């Protein structure tokens, strides 16, 4: 396993739309393993392949406190099951150090493939619903900062660009 480099906003590669996985093979399972290692190391609760510059529709997440509930979503799709919205303070490994409130549908139905390529469906609410929507956004080239005002997004962008310059 390997820890992968996480792209940071405003890197344009984060805007790439990920391609579906045709076959879940050993290379995809290795990617999943590397993504889990990267996510746990960061630490985070979710990671999309786009964030590690692999433009395939793969998401990993683990909402547990003790890394005991790893979840894999390959080619995930979701649909909202309610018009009711929940507001959560979201953060992102690609937007480090920033947390902002985002409104999202509070209940969604997810369809995806698991680590072995087997299809499954899941009804998600609360943090799981927020997380899957956030990670699916990554696969579509969208970030949580896109839900913010231009002023907030530009402020975050400028601060991260300054941090990047200071590290260079």
Curated annotation (Swiss-Prot):
It catalyses: N-terminal N-formyl-L-methionyl-[peptide] + H2O = N-terminal L-methionyl-[peptide] + formate. Keywords: Hydrolase, Iron, Metal-binding, Protein biosynthesis. Fe cation binds at residues 92, 134, 138. GO terms for molecular function: metal ion binding; peptide deformylase activity. Its cofactor is Fe(2+). The keyword Protein biosynthesis applies. It is an enzyme of class 3 (hydrolase). Removes the formyl group from the N-terminal Met of newly synthesized proteins. Requires at least a dipeptide for an efficient rate of reaction. N-terminal L-methionine is a prerequisite for activity but the enzyme has broad specificity at other positions. HAMAP family: Pep_deformylase. This is Peptide deformylase. The gene is def.
């Amino acid at each position: 396993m390997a820890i992968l480099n996480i792209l940071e906003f405003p890197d344009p590669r984060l805007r790439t739309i990920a391609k579906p996985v045709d076959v879940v093979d050993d290379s995809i399972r290795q990617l999943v393993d590397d993504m889990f290692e990267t996510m746990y190391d960061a630490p985070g609760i979710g990671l999309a392949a786009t964030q590690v510059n692999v433009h395939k529709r793969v998401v990993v997440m683990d909402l547990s406190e003790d890394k005991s509930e790893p979840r894999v979503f390959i080619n995930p799709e979701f649909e909202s099951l309610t018009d009711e919205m929940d507001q959560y303070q979201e953060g992102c490994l690609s937007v480090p150090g920033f947390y902002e409130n985002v409104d999202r549908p509070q209940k969604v139905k997810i369809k995806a493939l698991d680590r072995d390529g087997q299809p499954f469906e899941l009804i998600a609410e609360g943090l799981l619903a927020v997380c899957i929507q956030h990670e699916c956004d990554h696969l579509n080239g969208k970030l949580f900062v896109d839900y913010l005002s231009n002023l907030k997004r530009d402020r975050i962008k400028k601060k991260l660009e300054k941090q990047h310059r200071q590290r260079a």
